């Protein structure tokens, strides 16, 4: 959203990332203000790539290329959320195993695969050679290594290649981060068609999507020992196992666009906007987390959403308004017209 509406501020963000790398040897993953042990993934690569792919310039992009390559193959010696915890396993096996003492391993694997795709896209935009890019293009497909055809879900995997058993799609935490397999299976932002193919086509894919809403908001909180607030929010929202109060699944509804059922996306998007973003004391649906939850609303209210940052593409949803005009910094206007738009249409 910042790249679209406030590109001048985005330049400053990129300059800040350069400075963080120069001063610490790592890009920040959860800065407050220094490196903090929080969350998983190497998503600074996404922030860097999305800015450059969307035309943001005026900073040292080559230094950021050096940084994303460096961070993909090391971990901070004191802050394990910075860089890539488990990178040695990931580079060798194509996934972070669930039985080597690394928590939230499946979530890490899925995010690293997307991060590798971001590195590939960033390098491609910079004009890097195919020999430099090919390892990251291949690694972007590592999400396939966690797909368990028995369940049609992403499942933690042991170092010897076997899938974790016993397995419950309702178990929060463990191999995942503040969520369960029903949430994280869809974390293939960069290759929805590949995930559709794994599941056997549009129909089984859409049926699996439907199941997220149809399965009651039951849960297994044994990893935490108590229901964390994200679990409680899922229960209160009462949209099955859809947990909009936390970020891992917020792109999920838009995936109906990929399997030929955009009307389902439109209905669910409007339901979320109407129910979980209101001017009431309990009118906000969960974590804000660096602006993501509100950015989801702003994009969705305008009628489109960036399912995959760094792709330069937007999925079509349903605007709240019949006419939306965005005044671009260039002086041009971006306009969305939906004259027949209504609560029923």
Sequence positions of predicted segments:
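Core alpha-helical transmembrane segments of integral membrane proteins
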Residues: 1-2
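Active-site-surrounding "flap" and adjacent substrate/cofactor-binding loops of secreted or lumenal enzymes
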Residues: 7-32, 217-224, 230
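Generic internal hydrophobic packing segments that stabilize the cores of diverse globular domains
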Residues: 10-14, 45, 49, 65
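Active-site core of glycosidic bond-cleaving carbohydrate-active enzymes
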Residues: 18, 45, 55-141, 145-335, ...
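Aromatic/His-enriched, Gly/Pro-containing loop or helix-boundary segments
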Residues: 24-44, 49-53
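C-terminal beta-sandwich/jelly-roll accessory domains of carbohydrate-active enzymes
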Residues: 341-345
């Amino acid at each position: 959203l910042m790249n679209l509406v406030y590109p001048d501020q985005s330049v400053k963000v990129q300059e800040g990332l350069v400075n963080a790398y120069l001063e610490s040897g790592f890009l920040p993953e959860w800065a407050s203000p220094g490196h903090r042990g929080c969350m998983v993934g190497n998503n600074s690569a996404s922030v860097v790539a999305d800015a450059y792919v969307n035309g943001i310039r005026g900073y040292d992009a080559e230094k950021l290329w050096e940084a994303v390559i460096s961070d993909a193959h090391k971990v901070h010696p004191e802050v394990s959320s910075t860089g890539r915890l488990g990178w040695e396993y990931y580079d060798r096996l194509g996934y972070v195993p669930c039985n080597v003492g690394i928590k939230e391993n499946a979530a890490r694997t899925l995010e690293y695969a997307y991060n590798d795709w971001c590195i590939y896209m960033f390098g491609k935009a910079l004009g890097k050679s195919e020999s430099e890019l090919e390892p990251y293009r291949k690694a972007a497909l590592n999400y396939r290594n966690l797909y368990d055809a028995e369940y049609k879900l992403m499942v933690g995997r042991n170092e010897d290649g076997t899938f974790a058993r016993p397995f419950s799609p309702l178990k929060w935490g463990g191999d995942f981060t503040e969520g369960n397999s029903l949430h994280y299976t869809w974390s293939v932002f960069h290759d929805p068609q590949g995930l559709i193919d794994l599941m056997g086509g549009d129909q089984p894919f859409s049926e699996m999507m439907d199941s997220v809403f149809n399965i009651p908001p039951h849960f297994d909180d044994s990893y935490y020992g108590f229901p964390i607030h994200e679990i409680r929010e899922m229960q209160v929202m009462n949209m099955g196992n859809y947990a909009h109060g936390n970020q891992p699944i917020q792109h999920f509804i838009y995936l109906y666009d990929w399997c030929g059922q955009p009307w389902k996306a439109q209905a669910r998007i409007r339901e979320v906007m109407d129910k979980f973003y209101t001017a009431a004391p309990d009118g906000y649906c969960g974590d804000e987390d660096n602006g993501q939850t509100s950015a989801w609303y702003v994009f969705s209210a305008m009628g489109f959403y960036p399912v995959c940052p760094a792709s330069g593409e937007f999925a079509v949803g349903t605007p709240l308004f019949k006419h939306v005009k965005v005044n671009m910094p260039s002086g041009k206007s971006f306009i969305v017209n939906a004259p027949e738009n209504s609560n029923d249409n």
